[in-house]
Amino acid sequence: MPLSYQHFRRLLLLDEEAGPLEEELPRLADEDLNRRVAEDLHLQLPNVSIPWTHKVGNFTGLYSSTIPVFNPDWQTPSFPNIHLHQDIITKCEQFVGPLTVNEKRRLKLVMPARFFPNSTKYLPLDKGIKPYYPENVVNHYFQTRHYLHTLWKAGILYKRETSRSASFCGSPYTWEQDLQHGAFLDGPSRVGKEPFHQQSSRIPSRSPVGPSIQSKYQQSRLGLQSQKGPLARGQQGRSWSLWTRVHPSTRRPFGVEPSVSGHTNNFASRSASCLHQSSVREAAYSHLSTTKRQSSSGHAVELYSIPPSSTKSQSQGPVFSCWWLQFRDSEPCSDYCLSHLVNLLQDWGPCTEHGEYHIRIPRTPARVTGGVFLVDKNPHNTAESRLVVDFSQFSRGSARVSWPKFAVPNLQSLTNLLSSNLSWLSLDVSAAFYHIPLHPAAMPHLLVGSSGLSRYVARLSSDSRILDHQYGTLQNLHDSCSRQLYVSLMLLYKTFGRKLHLYSHPIILGFRKIPMGVGLSPFLLAQFTSAICSVVRRAFPHCLAFSYMDDVVLGAKSVQHLESLYTAVTNFLLSLGIHLNPNKTKRWGYSLNFMGYVIGSWGTLPQEHITQKIKQCFRKLPVNRPIDWKVCQRITGLLGFAAPFTQCGYPALMPLYACIQAKQAFTFSPTYKAFLCKQYMNLYPVARQRPGLCQVFADATPTGWGLAIGHQRMRGTFVAPLPIHTAELLAACFARSRSGAKLIGTDNSVVLSRKYTSFPWLLGCAANWILRGTSFVYVPSALNPADDPSRGRLGLCRPLLRLPFLPTTGRTSLYAVSPSVPSHLPDRVHFASPLHVTWKPP
């Protein structure tokens, strides 16, 4: 007869009619009973031959991705001119007085951020844009290129000009200028004042691209500037438009312009196939002999192009420079030939664009280190796209980077901190990750880009193969013409116009601000926002500012007070160069929505959309059918988030955790499903802990337990000896049920930690319910008043300790000790006794 649900509830002491707790509870620690119940509920059955279920409602296995949907009308989001001020520490000090050591350390971490992986794997440019949408290859290519171009224009990416130089838009930081031979970028006064220099012969010859750039430049990670002779410099104004290598090189740097000095670079024919001859850019743009460009100092800069004749290779016939413009002079091969499209415009614009500033970078190969693709911005906003960058190579394999850990407030700390009668609002930081600047030395490791449209299309169409010897010759120019490509490009022409030409060229971009796809970024963002909030909290001691990643919340006593705080904080953040999105500021009233929780003066509960998800999950959950452990991972993730709000908490999910660990399928019995279902249908808020004096103490030995409740002492014995942790847990439960006290003193670290998942399953579930909302204070064994009763000695009465309990707010220091501050700020309090901070994260 399988265990009925009612009987199971009674067994777990969840119903009122249970006998005395001192008799009932120790039974739940019995191994034999736990085994029988597990068998009854199919909790640990050996593997079964029934096929596993791989999908439950929306939950599929962890690694089976849902099929993404491409939207041809995606809008590329606009990025404001984000420039975090370099003197951020000075500005904060003007605002709040001297910063604490902690705040300074955190702000220095992101000014600039540095990234040096152990080794970097370089991928061919063809892998730059992932063929994520096979039906919309060309459309996705151009949308992605447009997104990358937008990021470059917004100063978020560097563009690789040559293997040792890059250009960017926006405002430069001093560490970018320092790379220019230790000097600032040339000011307008120095235009043309310097003679032309030959490059010094001391420059080491180029070594082949190794798996790791770092080793060679260990001494100076920024590319050995100290040993370099001055680079060839023409009369070109402030931002160097060209970097030329004066000694003839057999490998031409990717994407470099023809050299101004007049030397003809000798290309090897091999490089034609591997670096795609469109690297000779403006040579093809022959109908415009010079292109004017505003330099950053406001002077027009002229770039003289070499006539195409000088760029011919000696070893083969004419090499065509620009794949796109070649179609202009060729005969149409069909009705869908690209030459029809190219002839629509006389002026297709330049082959490449250059940034306002040029800097030196460590040697960067013409490769990428991660692929990119587009997805919906979020489930609620499918009109805009979001760029996904896959730098997962740094988290995999033997050379993987172990990312720094950082403190995330646990649920109880968060509740202690934010559960109050304040009015709340949350600020939206636009493109938060793109605020934090990266040092240029990280550029060779974080490269994205594309190989240009011609190679991209050729790669994907199996019938046209790129042969080394015929690349760029007429016979395979029209190989890429097809009806599908022609129709796609005609439609895209309406959107992008003459930019189609620019986007069809290869490009390599490195990150100038931290990208989302690297494990370092969340850490840096968390450090940055927590330091800023710490500064705000000290400037307005009567208010509360708190952040988790890019989610910043402000709380104040009244709505009027909150509005004035909002104005002051917004102005402060804008003065630092942090961009806020005022349209997305949310005013929450007295219950704050934050990190998936609703937090009010009554405590914390999960947000409504999460409870709806849980209900839906239980509706779809099959009974008596083995479910794939990967699907169980998804289910447990959802249920685990809401577990602290249920009667039995995490211990109720232990059977699921066990099967995931064993990588076995899990079968829900009707009783276990009904039990979980009932658990999650009634959620109880997690309340904030209150400070107080501990009056109740519990202690146990393997054979007996003892309590000290005020001046009263109690003791009892167990039927059979129990493991010490189990005995201590039982004693704590008895203390709670006898006294009703929410504050109990114990000398057992496991009970203090409130992790009841390692106890016998039934006992863990019952204890979680009995001890819900209880706070523990650590009392050393020698001073524990319950120590004597637990050893059977009632006569001796040790005096009760005065043990105060102060709830902790995790690592969020609300009472940061300020360095000497202006006198108008009130004195701050500092609680730092290890004995008082007794709370351990659940």
Swiss-Prot record:
Q: Which domain of life is it from?
A: Viruses
Which residues are noted in the entry as Mg(2+)-binding?
D428, D550, D551
Q: Where is this region: Disordered?
A: 184-238
Biological processes, Gene Ontology terms: DNA replication; symbiont-mediated suppression of host innate immune response
Question: Where in this protein does the record put region Polymerase/reverse transcriptase domain (RT)?
Answer: 346-689
Keyword presence, DNA-binding: yes
EC nos: 2.7.7.7, 2.7.7.49, 3.1.26.4
The regulatory note on its activity is:
Activated by host HSP70 and HSP40 in vitro to be able to bind the epsilon loop of the pgRNA. Because deletion of the RNase H region renders the protein partly chaperone-independent, the chaperones may be needed indirectly to relieve occlusion of the RNA-binding site by this domain. Inhibited by several reverse-transcriptase inhibitors: Lamivudine, Adefovir and Entecavir.
Q: What does this protein do?
A: Multifunctional enzyme that converts the viral RNA genome into dsDNA in viral cytoplasmic capsids. This enzyme displays a DNA polymerase activity that can copy either DNA or RNA templates, and a ribonuclease H (RNase H) activity that cleaves the RNA strand of RNA-DNA heteroduplexes in a partially processive 3'- to 5'-endonucleasic mode. Neo-synthesized pregenomic RNA (pgRNA) are encapsidated together with the P protein, and reverse-transcribed inside the nucleocapsid.
Protein name stated in the entry: Protein P
- Tell me which species this is from: Hepatitis B virus genotype G (isolate United States/USG17/2002)
